Every structure is written in C-alpha cells, then in structure tokens.
Swiss-Prot record:
GO terms for cellular component: cytoplasm; cytosol; membrane; plasma membrane. Residues 38-306 are annotated as: Disordered. It holds the Pfam family SH2. Keywords: B-cell activation, Cell membrane, Cytoplasm, Membrane, Phosphoprotein, SH2 domain. Residues 206-218, 256-270 have a biased composition (Polar residues). Residues 57-74, 172-187 have a biased composition (Acidic residues). The lineage of its organism: Eukaryota, Metazoa, Chordata, Craniata, Vertebrata. One of its GO terms (molecular function) is protein kinase binding. Residues 272-290 have a biased composition (Basic and acidic residues). CDD domains: SH2_BLNK_SLP-76. The modification Phosphotyrosine is found at residues 72, 84, 96, 178, 189. Residues 347-454 form the SH2 domain. This is B-cell linker protein.
Length: 457
C-alpha cells in the first residue's frame, strides 16, 4: 500500500521534494565533498628556502606521494620556481672574479715577512734588502689559498666580495708605518737600517766577548794555583770543579788559595786522598775551601798515630809475617807458662798432627778418650785443639785464646760460653761436667765426659 501511495502521490509534491534536495545539496557544498576536494588539491606546506642547491630537484618531487594526508604544502607546486634563483646558477665562474686575480694586478706588498723579521738581531745578520724582495713573492699564495676555500663554499657574492678586499686594506694601513723594500725605494729603506743594526751588532758582540773572557781570565789563575799547590787534588777534584764552581768563586778564590800552598806541599798528598768528598761538596765558595784545607794541617799528625793501630789488626788476622814478632812480646809469659804446665800432662801430645792424633784415639776405641795438641794453623787466637772420641767418631774442638781477658774458651764464639784461665782448667771442668759434641755433617749433638787420656806413640 505504501508503494501504491508513493506512486499515486501528486507530481507537485515530488517536485517540491526534488527542489529541497537540490537546495540541500547546494548548501552542503562546503561539506564533506568540498573537504575531499580540498584534500586532493592541497599539497604539503611550502618548505623554507634552502641555502644550498639541489642536485636533482626531480628526486625531491618523487619523495612526496599523492596520498600524503598532512597539511604540508609542496614547495614545487605553490612556490614560484621561476622566481627562485639557485646560488649555483648565480655564482658562475664567468661572472665572479676570485680575489687572487685582483691581487695579482696589484703591486706585491711584502709587509707580511717583515712583521716576522722586524727585530734588529734578525736584520743585522742579513743587511741586504734585495734578498727579502726576492722571497716576498711567495707570500701572495697565502690569500689565494683562502680564496680557493671561499670559492668552494656556496655563498652569495655580496658576502664574499666585502670579505676579501678589507684584508689588503688593513695591511696597507699597517704598512703605512713601515717602508716597503721595493727596488725604487731601496735608498729610502736602507738609511734607517744602516744606523740601527750597527749598534745592535756591536752591543752583543762586545758584551758577549768581554763577559766570558773576563770571567775566564780571572778564574783561570786560581785553577792553576790550586793545581800547583796540591798534586793529588788535580786528579780527583779538578775535573768536576772546573765547569761550575770556578765562575761562582770569581775573584775571591785568588787570594785565599795563594796563602795555603806552602804548608800543603808537604802533606797535602796524603790528606787530600782521605777527604776529597768535602772539597767537592764545598767547591762553590772560596771560604768553604779554606775550611776544608785549614783542618787538613792538624790531621797530618793523626796518620802517625793511626799507623801503629792497623799493625796489630793484621797480626790478629793471622798473617804469618806479623805473627812472629808481635805475639811474642805480650804472650811470651802466658805461652811459656802454658807450655810448662802442659808439658808433664799425659793427655798433651805437643806438636802432633791431626792424622796421628785421630789414629791414636781410634786405637783406644773408648768413649771419652781425649788429648790436647797444638793447632796445625799456628794461630795465636787458636793455639790448641781438643781431640775427643765418642761413638766411634773423633771430634776436633778448637781452643780459643781471648786477648782482651787473657782467657780460653772452647769452640766457636757463642753467647753464654764459659771462659777458663788455662787449658788445664778446661780439662778438669769437663772431666766432671759433660762436654757437648756437635756433628756438623749429621747435625746431631752428643755429650760425654773426658775420661781417658791418650798418648801418641
């Protein structure tokens, strides 16, 4: 029925409905369809102008797709490409003249090398101005290097052209104070130079020549005086003392060294050998050298006192040449008494050697058998040796003589050892008290009493 009603609707109503629809469509032109059209028409926003030229502008167009949904405008579509001028097109080699071409037309300004060598010392060695004028043309290459770098950079001519010319202008302003050594102006340039280098050459030469000569002349005589005064000192202290102390000593060393030579000729050779170190330490001042040399005279008597002192030391060391006379004087009484006391004892073998003494003890083959014999080394510190037998072994124990206390002791020096007034007291003590026997090979200790006296046949 609804369909029939719709069909039967009068034509006037249908017209009205159509008019309303058309009117609504016209009013909705700014609606969705209009927005869709704008989206299709609009491109990405314009890009700010770049300071460099693109190699292939077509490549940039390919980067933006048609479906790009943002509000970014494409600069190729909206911007006037014809009005935009690329810097590469404008800065052509034909229209732009590099700065070195302008400077080559000008006169070469040699102010740059003269700023370096403006000092008088450098000018004095090279008086002639022509060599400087020959070397000056090498400097124009300096601005040309910067011009090459400037040409590679993509910058407008308005920025580059004002940068290049002010540099030579500044140089010309600085050069106004100086005279350029051109061939035409050589005469005007040489006159002030001739007056200035002459005093500059004389001043250093005079000062440098006089200072070392004056110091060497004044210092050399004291060195020779010191060498003549002491013969031994020349070989030891002359070499290190020559470079540094002599210029420091100066004029003061001349007078004190002259006063000391006469007495030092006799004994300086012996004394200077003992004390070279203080002389080297105080070689800087003349007064310290006097203090070193002045006490040298009294010690000349000290070596006389020290000479007899080492003699008994050599005798104590056991030198055979000194043992003969020296121990005989203090020990005549003691050794004579010992020999008299030991001569009648049954256990004293006298000047028996070690082998025969050991054989005699092995023949006895009794633990505690013993004898006393003279030491084979004939040492004043070890005059006798105690030979004991225990556990089928023979022990040779040295009997030491202590000079300070005139006493005897057994074995090597050790803490808490016993001292005896004679060899007989040693035998009597160990006949009642055990004697410690140390085997150095097996590192063992045994003890026994001296029981059986053995005679060597």
């Amino acid at each position: 029925m609804d369909k029939l009603n719709k069909i039967t609707v009068p034509a006037s109503q249908k017209l009205r409905q159509l008019q309303k629809m058309v009117h609504d469509i016209k009013n909705n032109e700014g609606g969705i369809m209009d927005k869709i059209k704008k989206l299709k028409v609009k491109g990405p926003p314009s890009v700010p102008r770049r300071d460099y030229a693109l190699d292939n502008p077509a490549d940039e167009e390919e980067q933006w797709s048609d479906d790009f949904d943002s509000d970014y405008e494409n600069p190729d579509e909206h911007s006037d490409s014809e009005m935009y001028v690329m810097p590469a097109e404008e800065t052509g080699d034909d229209s732009y003249e590099p700065p070195p071409a302008e400077q080559q037309t000008r006169v070469v300004h040699p102010a740059l090398p003269f700023t370096r060598g403006e000092y008088v010392d450098n000018r004095s060695s090279q008086r002639h101005s022509p060599p400087f004028s020959k070397t000056l043309p090498s400097k124009p290459s300096w601005p040309s290097a910067k011009a090459r770098l400037a040409s590679t950079l993509p910058a407008p001519n308005s920025l580059q052209k004002p940068q290049v010319p002010p540099k030579p202008k500044d140089l010309l302003e600085d050069e106004a104070d100086y005279v350029v050594p051109v061939e035409d102006n050589d005469e005007n340039y040489i006159h002030p130079r001739e007056s200035s280098p002459l005093p500059a050459e004389k001043a250093p030469t005079v000062n440098r020549s006089t200072k070392p000569n004056s110091s060497s002349k004044h210092v050399s005589p004291p060195g020779t005086v010191a060498g003549r005064n002491s013969g031994v000192w020349d070989s030891k202290s002359s070499l290190p003392a020559a470079p540094s102390p002599l210029p420091r000593a100066g004029k003061k060393t001349a007078t004190p060294l002259k006063t000391t030579p006469v007495p030092s000729l006799q004994n300086a050779s012996n004394v200077c050998e003992e004390k070279p170190v203080p002389a080297e330490r105080h070689r800087g001042s003349s007064h310290r050298q006097d203090t070193v040399q002045s006490p040298v005279f009294p010690p000349t008597q000290k070596p006389v006192l020290q000479k007899p002192v080492p003699l008994p030391r050599f005798t104590e060391g056991g030198s055979p040449a000194a043992d003969g006379p020296v121990p005989s004087f203090p020990f005549n009484s003691t050794f004579a008494d010992q020999e008299a006391e030991l001569h009648g004892k049954p256990w004293y073998a006298g000047a028996c050697d070690r082998k025969s003494a050991e054989e005699a003890l092995h023949r006895s083959n009794k633990d505690g058998s013993f004898l006393i014999r003279k030491s084979s080394g004939h040492d004043s510190k070890q005059p006798y040796t105690l030979v004991a037998f225990f556990n089928k072994r023979v022990y040779n124990i040295p009997v030491r003589f202590i000079e300070a206390t005139k006493q005897y002791a057994l074995g090597k020096k050790k803490n808490g050892e016993e001292y005896f007034g004679s060899v007989v007291e040693i035998i009597k003590n160990h006949q009642h008290n055990p004697l410690v026997l140390i085997d150095s090979q097996n590192n063992t200790k045994d003890s026994t009493r001296l029981k059986y006296a053995v005679k060597v046949s």
